[in-house]
Amino acid sequence: MFSYIAGIDEAGRGSVIGPLVVCSAFCDRNNEKALKRLCSKDSKQLSARQREEAYAELKKFCSFRWVEISAADLNRLMPDMNLNDIEAKAMADLAKQMKEGDLMIDMPDRYAWTFRKRMERFGARRFEAEHKADETYPIVAAASICAKITRDAKIEQIRSQVGDFGSGYPSDPKTRNALKDRGMREKLKPFVRERWKTLENLKQKKLFEGEE
């Protein structure tokens, strides 16, 4: 057993606007008790304020790193790589930057063997992986908190430039309405994942009514 534990998770995978953020969290195993106290709830159930408060405490004993993949980068990469490959490469890059320790990853693939093959292709170090690992492993939940906070800050930055468009997720009525509006859609163009399946699905549902 190593003296260090580490976790990797992402935020923004299913979004149609804004970046995909992949984050790693790393700490000494002696801090597991504090880690469990701060990350006892699923990070998705925490309010933005609760995440900020938890993150401020986590930074006292955890190290965080992240990779931000912008919508423009995703649009550029998507013709040659699928989303799972893009995410796996970012995760492998973060894993290679860590000290040796027990690493758990919240894998995007449903099956571990598929994800492991992806990670090996990108030269990842030794790791374990589970689907929805952030719900079971506090160190992965810590990485999830960091990823969400980092992405939220970027979304707020975009919002300050173009106006309110909601969360950026296609399930959000504000986001769908923003994409319906010609003027707003033009402002959002640099931040929209044009090659995203979610955007194609919205188009198929006649999101852009009255347009060819």
Model-assigned labels for residue ranges:
Residues M1-E212:
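RNase H-like, Mg2+-dependent phosphodiesterase core
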